Design a protein with these regions (language model features):
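N-lobe entry segment of adenylate-forming
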Residues: 1-96, 113, 119, 125, ...
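Conserved AMP-binding/adenylate-forming core of the ANL superfamily
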Residues: 41, 66-120, 137-147, 194-203, ...
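Conserved ATP-binding/catalytic segment of the ANL
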Residues: 421-481, 619-620
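Conserved AMP-binding/adenylation subdomain of ANL enzymes
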Residues: 243-263, 270-339
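Conserved structural elements of the adenylate-forming
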Residues: 85-91, 201-207, 216, 235-257
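Conserved AMP-binding A3 loop
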Residues: 77-82, 211-213, 220-247
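Conserved pre-ATP/AMP-binding loop-to-beta segment of ANL
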Residues: 61-64, 190-224, 230-231, 256-263
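Gly/Ser/Thr-rich phosphate-binding loop
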Residues: 286-288, 306, 315-319, 328-402, ...
C-alpha cells in the first residue's frame, strides 16, 4: 500500500449524516447540452408557511422557536411556538384592520424576534413581507436604492426596530398613506404605532378566514436582488416556492430520527434569501429552534458569536469562509468552545465564496481533536429567484468549491459556453417573475422555461456527472485579453485571494481588452494588523506597509508560479486599495459580494494606473 493511500485510509470517518441517494438522470443532447434531475420525487410539503407555525403551536406549544439576546445584561429572550402563534394572530388582525388589500409590509431593520413575527403576520394577512437591506437606510448617503424600492413596491406598512436609528431614511421617504410601526422608540416627527400595541389587538374570526384563503400561489415575500447589475429587483416568492424549497433542503439532509431537535445559531440577514429563506424556513418547518446571532464574521463583532457558541450547541451551522477563519482561530485557543460547538453538530455549511483548503483542514483538525470524527462541509447553490437553493453537496466529500447536484424537483440545464457550461434552472422553487417589472420577467427564461441564472459550472468528471459540479463564476464577468485568451474571473479571483491570504479580503480582476491581467485588492485589515503587530493600523497605512506589501506580493508570485504558462491565470500587476467597497457606488451587494463590473468602472483611474507604461510606486509589478 502506498503512503498516500494509507494516509487516506487513516482519516477519521465523517459523523453520520443520512444523505439522500444521488440517483441522477442525465440527458445528453446533440448540441452538447446536458440536463440533470433527480429520479427521486420531491417529498410532500405544507401548502403555506403559516401552516407550519400553526402545526408546532398545536403539537409543541412550549417549545422554543426563536431566541435573541437583549436588555442591559444581554440575556436570551425566548419565544415559544405557542406564544408566537398568539402574537402573530394578533398582528394579523391588526394588519387586516388596516385594509392592506395585498399591499406589502416593508421591514427596514435587521433580524429580530419582532421581524420574524411581523413576517408571519403579513403572510397570514396575505400581504407580502418585504425585508429591505438595513444598509440601504443606514449606510447610504442619498437613499437612492431605498427610495427606488419604496416606489416600486408601494408598501402599506413600514416596520423598523428603532425610530431614531432610521430617522434619516424615514424622512427621505414619502410616507403618505403608509402606517409606520416601531418596536423600541418612535421617530420624532414621524407618526407611528408601536409593535406592542398591535400585538395586543383582539383576534376575530377574520384571521382564520384570511389564512384559509392562502394558496400555493399567494405571494409570501418580496425579496430584493443584491443589485449587482443595476437597481435591485423585487423577486416574487410564492408560498409554494418557499415551502417546496424547505422540503428540498430537508429531504437531501434529513435530521437523524431520534437525534437532537434542529438547533440553529445564525446571523445571516433575513433581507437576503440565504438568511431569510434557507436558514429560517427549514427550522420553522421542522419545529426547531433558531437562535438569532447578533454577531458578525468581522473584527469587533465576532465576540458575540463566540459568546453564543459557548452556550448553544447547534445541530447545523452555516457561515461564510471569513467567519469560519475567525471561528477556527478562536477555537484553536479554547477547548471548551470546541466542545460546545461540535457537541451536536452534524453539518457545517458555507457559502458566499470558496472555502480555502487550509481552512477546511484546520476545522477538521479541531473536529477530530474534539470528537474523534470529521464533520462534513456542505454547500448549496441558487439565487434569490430560486428560493434560493437548487443544488447541494448531499454526500460525504472532502472537496470544496462544488455546488453539488440538483435537488428533487429541480432540473439543471447545462448549456455549452466555451470551456464550461452556462447553468439554467427549472422547478417548483423558481419564481414566476419580478414584481412590477414584466419586461424583466420575460428576459429571465429561455425557450423551455429554464431560468437563466447567469452562473457557470463544469463537471468534476465529464464521464461521471454524479461526482458533482464545480462553480465556475459568473458568465457575464468573464472577458478576453487582447491576445484572445479567455479569462474566467470567478475562479481566478478566489484563487488569487486564497494565494494572498491572510492579507487580502477581496479583489477586482482587470484585463478586458488589455494585454495582461491586473488585480486591485482590498486588504483584510484585521489580518494586516496582526501581521505588523499594530492594532490601530488604518487602511491607508496598511496598503503602504512594507510587510503587508511583501506578504501580498509573495502570495501572488506563488500563484503565478503554479500557473506558469497559462496566460489566462497569470497576474502581471497588482495594487492594494485603501477605500472600502461602496454600497452607494454599487460595488458591494447586500450579500457582501463584489460587483466586478461596477467596481472596475468606479475605480477606472486605478485601473489606468495598473496599465500605465511606467507604473507608479504603488503598483506591484509581477511580470
Amino acid at each position: 500500500m502506498s503512503g498516500s493511500a494509507a494516509a487516506v485510509m487513516a482519516k477519521p470517518a465523517f459523523r453520520k449524516v443520512e444523505w439522500l441517494a444521488r440517483d441522477i438522470d442525465v440527458e445528453r443532447r446533440a448540441d452538447g447540452t446536458v440536463v440533470l434531475k433527480s429520479r427521486i420525487p420531491l417529498q410532500t410539503y405544507e401548502k403555506h408557511l403559516p401552516a407550519s407555525l400553526a402545526k408546532w403551536a398545536k403539537e409543541a406549544p412550549g417549545r422554543i422557536w426563536l431566541a435573541q439576546r437583549g436588555g442591559p445584561n444581554r440575556e436570551w429572550r425566548k419565544v415559544s411556538y405557542g406564544e408566537a402563534k398568539r402574537t402573530v394572530d394578533a398582528l394579523t388582525q391588526a394588519l387586516l384592520d388596516l385594509n392592506l388589500n395585498g399591499r406589502p409590509v416593508a421591514i427596514l431593520s435587521g433580524n429580530s424576534i419582532e421581524h420574524a413575527l411581523m413576517t408571519q403576520a403579513a403572510m397570514q394577512a396575505r400581504s407580502p413581507a418585504a425585508p429591505v437591506s438595513p444598509a440601504y437606510s443606514l449606510m447610504s448617503h442619498d437613499h437612492v436604492k431605498l427610495k427606488y424600492l419604496f416606489d416600486l413596491i408601494k408598501p402599506a406598512v413600514v416596520m423598523l426596530q428603532d425610530g431614531p436609528t432610521f430617522e434619516k431614511a424615514l424622512k427621505a421617504l414619502d410616507l403618505t398613506g403608509v402606517t409606520v410601526v416601531h418596536v423600541v422608540r418612535p421617530c420624532e416627527g414621524v407618526k407611528s404605532v408601536s409593535f406592542a400595541e398591535l400585538a395586543q389587538t383582539p383576534v376575530t374570526a377574520d384571521v382564520d378566514a384570511s389564512i384559509a384563503k392562502i394558496t400555493p400561489d399567494t405571494v409570501g415575500k418580496l425579496l430584493f436582488t443584491s443589485g449587482s447589475t443595476g437597481m435591485p429587483k423585487a423577486v416574487i416568492n410564492t408560498q409554494e416556492m418557499m415551502c417546496a424549497n424547505a422540503a428540498m433542503m430537508m429531504q437531501v439532509r434529513p435530521r437523524t430520527p431520534g437525534g437532537p431537535l434542529a438547533t440553529v445559531l445564525d446571523w445571516m440577514p433575513w433581507n437576503h434569501t440565504m438568511g431569510g429563506n434557507a436558514a429560517f424556513h427549514p427550522v420553522l418547518v421542522d419545529g426547531g429552534t433558531l437562535y438569532i446571532d447578533d454577531g458578525r464574521p468581522m473584527p469587533g463583532q465576532l465576540e458575540e458569536t463566540i459568546k453564543n457558541l459557548r452556550e448553544i450547541s447547534p445541530t447545523y451551522y452555516a457561515n461564510v469562509p471569513a467567519g469560519y477563519a475567525a471561528l477556527a482561530a478562536a477555537m484553536e485557543k479554547d477547548d471548551a468552545l470546541c466542545r460546545s460547538f461540535f457537541k451536536n453538530l452534524s453539518i457545517m455549511a458555507y457559502g458566499g465564496a470558496r472555502l480555502p483548503d487550509d481552512l477546511y483542514d484546520r476545522m477538521q483538525a479541531l473536529a477530530v481533536k474534539t470528537t474523534g470524527e470529521r464533520i462534513v462541509f456542505y454547500t448549496g447553490w441558487g439565487s434569490t429567484e430560486t428560493a434560493p437553493t437548487s443544488t447541494g453537496t448531499y454526500w460525504d466529500t472532502e472537496r470544496v468549491g462544488l455546488i453539488g447536484l440538483p435537488f428533487p424537483g429541480v432540473e439543471l440545464k447545462m448549456v455549452p459556453c466555451g470551456s464550461k457550461y452556462e447553468l439554467r434552472l427549472r422547478g417548483v422553487n423558481v419564481t414566476p417573475g419580478y414584481f412590477g417589472q414584466p419586461d424583466l420577467t420575460k428576459k429571465m427564461f429561455d425557450e423551455e422555461g429554464f431560468y437563466c441564472i447567469g452562473d457557470a459550472g463544469i463537471f468534476v468528471d465529464d464521464s461521471d456527472p454524479v461526482k458533482g459540479i464545480i462553480f465556475a463564476g459568473r458568465v457575464v464577468e468573464d472577458f478576453k485579453l487582447t491576445t484572445g485568451t479567455f479569462v474566467h474571473v470567478g475562479s481566478l479571483r478566489t484563487d488569487a485571494i486564497a494565494a494572498a491570504t491572510p492579507v487580502v479580503h477581496d479583489a477586482l480582476v482587470a484585463g478586458q481588452d488589455r494585454a495582461f491581467i491586473g488585480l486591485l485588492a482590498w486588504p483584510n485589515l484585521h489580518a494586516c494588523r496582526q501581521l505588523v503587530g499594530n492594532p490601530d493600523l488604518s487602511f491607508e497605512d496598511a496598503v503602504k506597509h512594507p510587510e503587508v506589501i511583501a506578504c501580498f506580493k509573495r502570495g501572488l508570485q506563488a500563484h503565478n508560479k503554479e500557473c506558469e504558462g497559462a496566460s489566462s491565470r497569470i497576474i502581471a500587476r497588482a495594487m492594494l486599495m485603501a477605500e472600502p467597497p461602496s454600497i452607494d457606488g454599487n460595488e458591494l451587494t447586500d450579500k457582501g459580494y463584489i460587483n466586478q463590473r461596477a467596481g472596475l468602472e468606479r475605480r477606472a483611474a486605478l485601473v489606468e494606473r495598473l496599465y500605465a507604461d511606467k507604473p507608479d510606486q504603488d503598483v506591484i509589478v509581477l511580470r
